From Swiss-Prot:
<feature type="compositionally biased region" description="Polar residues">
    <location>
        <begin position="492"/>
        <end position="501"/>
    </location>
</feature>
<comment type="function">
    <text>Palmitoyl acyltransferase.</text>
</comment>
<keyword id="KW-0449">Lipoprotein</keyword>
<keyword id="KW-0968">Cytoplasmic vesicle</keyword>
<feature type="transmembrane region" description="Helical">
    <location>
        <begin position="41"/>
        <end position="61"/>
    </location>
</feature>
<feature type="compositionally biased region" description="Polar residues">
    <location>
        <begin position="591"/>
        <end position="603"/>
    </location>
</feature>
<feature type="region of interest" description="Disordered">
    <location>
        <begin position="680"/>
        <end position="706"/>
    </location>
</feature>
<feature type="transmembrane region" description="Helical">
    <location>
        <begin position="275"/>
        <end position="295"/>
    </location>
</feature>
<feature type="active site" description="S-palmitoyl cysteine intermediate">
    <location>
        <position position="202"/>
    </location>
</feature>
<keyword id="KW-0472">Membrane</keyword>
<dbReference type="InterPro" id="IPR039859">
    <property type="entry name" value="PFA4/ZDH16/20/ERF2-like"/>
</dbReference>
<protein>
    <recommendedName>
        <fullName>Probable protein S-acyltransferase 20</fullName>
        <ecNumber>2.3.1.225</ecNumber>
    </recommendedName>
</protein>
<feature type="compositionally biased region" description="Polar residues">
    <location>
        <begin position="697"/>
        <end position="706"/>
    </location>
</feature>
<dbReference type="GO" id="GO:0005886">
    <property type="term" value="C:plasma membrane"/>
</dbReference>
<dbReference type="Pfam" id="PF01529">
    <property type="entry name" value="DHHC"/>
</dbReference>
<keyword id="KW-0808">Transferase</keyword>
<keyword id="KW-0564">Palmitate</keyword>
Length: 706
């Protein structure tokens, strides 16, 4: 429930105690203190001094409790003439609509901001007119004028146009109030509203202390301290007279209070009230001195609490800035957990196989164990206290004037700014339309750089895939799903293009060549996407060459990254890891297909070489069925079933050839589920290749799984 002021029910226990003690002390002063000071003159003087102070304390307390310290931009919630629920729903609806427009097209940012600005101006004008009409009607009511003295906010220096413009640019959006608030506003959990320049929530007032009532609060503390000092001083004087002038006091007690009241009860009542006043002076005086230091340093109680909490959680001898830097590398820091693997920031980890996600706790790598229980990725099971499953609650920060005197106000302001930036309730007004995931994962990376990075990564993957397709058009072997050699040696093939380190390498790209050096020979590019079940979703490209297939000049800045692939070695009688040709070798092979011969050191079966004049026709000729079966099936001893895959024919393949290849694919698909097994060779430390086997009547699997 949103609380408008401190007098709104339910009342806090400390508020009731404060009001009760004030009333008892005032009654005790007029009944037991002033009449027994000594003479009528002293009595009238003390009453004349005490009464204004007590009235001032009463007025200031009522005023400080009755003032609504809420942010000016949410004051319409407390207007009785407006339906608060409807306004909140309208704000939420506008917030969602504007957010959806921003997500749909970045080009509408300026237009939506202009519309939002016009609507906010219109709403502010309507609110001002409504408040003015209400104030005019209340001017004719004397009781309303009297109450206005207690509820009007403090007179503070008005902000100039430059400051107002700066506050509007640095405004925040409260997700609980569904409204834009000022930069230094904070949402109070007790009052359930955003308080302008939040200082603290006072339980004795049952109200928040902010910009609108801070002057009244300081004045209340000063007046209360003076009132308690007068109360305690007069009480001490009365107690002294009770024990010094016994006969005189007995006569005065009988004259003022009657025969039923003696000297002992008077001493007890005066002594109790005096003790309460004295004991109340010390914490109140400390609080007033504490706020004097806050005013001198130019910070608020909230900033002091945030700074002290950061210093208490920091290691010994570390400042607030060093503690925050350590938090950035902790598992709970949003700056560390928000970075994605596809960013261009160079993550300090490489692709892993089947290990849990790595977490960096104070720059030390922590790998959680794979326990049966559910363990969050940001929690170290080996850390002490992790068995509780929840983080210990933050200890309350005690008020210490000595620590405040030594505190640097700049550090306190920076700590408060970081606390506001990391708040899940208050969001920057420029980013309030972004989804929560974007806000937590982008971090300090700008949106423009993220978009450009994603575009570079996509272009890099397309270029690498095209290079591999061009090289595989002359080779009947396809790269495997991955090998452990790639991970150990750091080389990356087609299988680990999505690893973080590989993505980082492929982010920096040179611009694509505009004028190719050789345009005489054009090749038909074939793009195919095959799943593990060999479905028939085959995509063919046209005869025209794609711009990504054009040959780059000799001064191209594209890096020739070494890639590996699993191929069959007839001499060794097993599959081995061999480097895939680089982009320059692919260009030479495509330009001079007749010069390519089988290597004796690393024999790799390739398509028969043809001259350049008949190269395109050779590509269009389909392979006979018996040759396809021979190439797809290995009949010797092997640790795997089957052999490499057959290449997908080009678009110009005749209909009869496509039918033969389709039959081969259907037979391969029926064999995969029957004979495919996933095992690992402990001798060669080689990962399995997911390739079909057992094709044909004469094929022999004959492999012994180790």
């Amino acid at each position: 429930m949103v609380r408008k002021h401190g007098w709104q029910l339910p009342a806090h226990t400390l508020q009731v105690i404060a009001i009760t003690v004030f009333c008892l002390l005032v009654v005790a002063f007029y009944a037991f203190f002033a009449p027994f000071v000594g003479g009528r003159i002293w009595e009238y003087v003390l009453i004349g001094v005490y009464s204004p102070v007590a009235i001032l304390v009463f007025v200031l307390y009522v005023r400080c409790t009755a003032i609504n310290p809420a942010d000016p931009r949410i004051m319409s919630i407390f207007d009785t003439g407006v339906n608060g629920d409807g306004m909140v729903r309208g704000l939420s609806r506008n917030y969602d609509e504007t957010g959806s427009q921003l997500q749909a097209s970045p080009s509408v940012v300026s237009r939506s901001s202009t519309v939002a600005g016009n609507s906010s101006v219109k709403g502010s004008v309507e609110d001002a007119q409504r408040v003015e009409s209400v104030s005019r009607r209340s001017c004719y009511n004397p009781l309303a004028v009297f109450c206005y003295v207690f509820v009007v906010e403090d007179c503070r220096k008005k902000e100039g146009p430059a400051e107002e413009q700066g506050n509007s640019e640095e405004a925040l959006f409260c997700t609980l109030c569904n409204c834009e608030v000022r930069k230094f506003s904070k949402h109070c959990r007790s009052c359930d509203k955003c308080v302008d320049c939040f200082d603290h929530h006072c339980k004795w007032l049952n109200n928040c202390v902010g910009r609108k009532n801070y002057v009244t609060f300081v004045s209340l503390m000063s007046a209360s301290l003076l009132w308690l000092i007068i109360e305690a001083a007069v009480g001490i004087a009365v107690i002294v007279r009770v024990f010094v002038n016994k006969q005189t006091m007995e006569t005065e007690i009988v004259n003022r209070l009657g025969n039923s009241f003696s000297r002992a009860p008077l001493a007890a009542v005066v002594g109790l009230c005096t003790a309460v006043a004295i004991f109340a002076c010390f914490p109140l005086g400390e609080l007033l001195f504490f706020h004097m230091l806050l005013i001198k340093k130019g910070i608020t109680t909230y900033e002091y609490v945030v700074a002290m909490r950061a210093m208490s959680e920091a290691p010994d001898g570390a400042s607030v800035d060093e503690e925050i830097q350590n938090v950035l590398y902790s598992p709970t820091g949003s700056a560390t957990t928000g970075f994605s693997g596809g960013s261009s920031l160079g993550l300090p980890y490489r692709g892993v196989w089947c290990t849990p996600p790595r977490v960096f706790d104070n720059q030390d790598e922590v790998i959680p164990h794979l326990d049966p229980c559910m363990v969050p990725s940001t929690v170290d099971p080996d850390a002490p206290g992790s068995e509780k499953g929840t983080k210990a609650l933050k200890r309350p920060v005690k008020r210490n004037a000595w620590k405040l005197a030594k505190l640097d106000p700049n550090e306190a302001a920076r700590a408060a700014a970081r606390a506001r930036a990391s708040s899940s309730v208050l969001r920057p007004i420029d980013n309030r339309h972004l989804p929560d995931n974007d806000l937590s994962s982008i971090g300090t990376v700008s949106i423009i750089s993220s978009v450009s990075t994603d575009a570079n990564v996509a272009a890099s993957k397309e270029i690498r895939n095209n290079d591999l397709r061009s090289s595989l058009s002359r080779n009947s072997f396809a790269p495997s799903q991955g090998s452990r050699d790639e991970y150990d040696t750091g080389s990356h093939g087609m299988s680990n293009l999505s690893s973080p380190s590989h993505v980082h390498e492929s982010v920096t790209l040179a611009p694509l060549p505009q004028n190719p050096t050789i345009v005489g020979n054009r090749f038909t590019a074939t793009s195919h996407h095959m799943h593990s079940t060999f479905d028939d979703k085959v995509l063919h490209r046209g005869n025209d060459a794609d711009p990504l297939f054009l040959f780059a000049p000799a001064t191209s800045h594209l890096r020739d990254v070494r890639k590996t692939s699993v191929v069959w070695d007839p001499e060794a009688g097993r599959y081995v890891s061999a480097p895939v040709t680089t982009t320059s070798e692919v260009r030479n092979r495509l330009l001079n297909p007749s010069s390519q011969t089988a290597s004796t050191q690393n024999p790799r079966p390739i398509l028969p070489a043809h001259d350049s004049s008949s190269g395109s026709s050779a590509l269009r000729d389909p392979l006979p069925l018996h040759q396809a079966e021979r190439r797809l099936t290995y009949t010797g001893d092997s640790i795997f079933y089957g052999g490499p895959l057959i290449n997908i024919p080009t678009r110009d393949t005749p209909r009869s050839g496509r039918g033969l290849v389709r039959d081969v694919q259907d037979r391969l698909a029926s064999t995969v589920h029957r004979d495919a097994r996933i095992r690992r060779d402990s001798t060669s430390n080689q990962l399995p290749v997911f390739a079909p086997g057992g094709l044909g009547a004469n094929s022999q699997t004959g492999s012994n799984i180790k």
